[in-house]
């Protein structure tokens, strides 16, 4: 019978495995590398993202309207009313329509630059159709004589830019046609002369000064309809300015009274 003897182990003494600690330095390096790569990729996109927030979008219009419409300042509420027009789809139409009076309007999906101004004021309770007609009925000779008319016409007179300019100059505050942006305020009405302007408008155009969109809200933009419907654009100085007015209801005008008494003829536009 074999006599088996135990064999002595002569290798290394077994030891408990050491607990490994995480490599914190390597983790931070990886994190910093990730952030650096992200910065390099995203940084060039920042101006683009900022510009997107400053576009004349419907969302930006609604945001601006919300900020302006509750103001006690009539001019700011007028700017809100003008911006509200930009959310509507309007086909350019300068045609003659038979309108009710007062408060008459052509179909809401049609219009020109003058209609935009008339509708903006009317939404605040100021009916330029009635105001212009009443003044022309009393002082027809003081208005531009560009259409071979012998008497006022409540269907069309308030839709003609030169007539609106004349009314604003008589009953509002007529301001300098300044080249400086600082001389214009939100809610001002501006008249331009266009080289391509419609003959029935005397080559004139009209719009309302409003804030710029989003991050550009400190800028002075305009709402106008130059053929593509109501638009919110940075175009205050893109055309020759020939009229600058500030008109709010209830403001007494010494200009109109003096002109009526003196029989002063209108300034050509």
What is the predicted function of each stretch?
Residues 130-134, 194-196, 226-227, 248:
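A mature extracytoplasmic/lumenal domain signature
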Residues 74, 137-223:
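...with weaker cross-activation on analogous glycine-rich loops/strands in unrelated enzymes
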Residues 217-269:
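Low-complexity, Gly/Ser/Thr/Pro-rich intrinsically disordered linker/tail segments
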Residues 13-14, 18, 265-267:
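Short, basic, low-complexity termini and linkers enriched in Ser/Thr/Gly/Pro
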Residues 15-34:
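N-terminal Sec-pathway targeting helices
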Residues 34-45:
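Hydrophobic alpha-helical membrane-insertion segments, chiefly the h-region
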Residues 11, 23, 44-165:
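N-terminal capping segments
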Residues 1-12:
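N-terminal intrinsically disordered, acidic low-complexity segments at the extreme N-terminus
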């Amino acid at each position: 019978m074999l006599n088996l003897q135990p064999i002595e182990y002569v290798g290394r003494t077994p030891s408990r495995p050491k607990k490994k600690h995480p490599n914190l330095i390597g983790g931070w390096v990886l994190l910093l590398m990730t952030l650096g790569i992200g910065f390099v990729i995203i940084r060039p996109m920042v101006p683009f993202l900022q510009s997107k927030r400053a576009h004349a979008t419907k969302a930006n219009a609604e945001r601006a309207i919300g900020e302006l419409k509750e103001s006690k300042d009539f001019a700011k509420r007028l700017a809100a009313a003008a911006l509200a027009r930009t959310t509507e789809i309007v086909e350019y139409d300068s045609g003659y329509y038979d309108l009710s009076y007062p408060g008459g309007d052509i179909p809401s999906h049609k219009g020109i630059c003058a209609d935009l101004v008339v509708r903006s004021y009317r939404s605040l309770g100021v009916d330029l159709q009635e105001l212009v007609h009443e003044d022309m009925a009393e002082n027809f000779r003081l208005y531009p004589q560009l259409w071979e008319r012998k008497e006022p016409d409540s269907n069309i007179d308030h839709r003609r830019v030169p007539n609106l300019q004349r009314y604003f100059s008589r009953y509002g505050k007529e301001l300098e046609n300044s080249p400086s942006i600082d001389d214009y305020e939100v809610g001002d009405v501006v008249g331009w002369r266009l080289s391509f302007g419609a003959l029935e408008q005397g080559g004139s155009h009209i719009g309302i000064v409003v804030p710029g969109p989003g991050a550009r809200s400190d800028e002075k933009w305009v709402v106008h309809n130059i053929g593509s419907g109501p638009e919110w654009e940075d175009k205050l100085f893109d055309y020759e300015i020939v009229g600058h007015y500030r008109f709010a209801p209830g403001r007494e005008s010494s200009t109109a009274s003096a002109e009526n008494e003196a029989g002063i003829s209108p300034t050509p536009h």
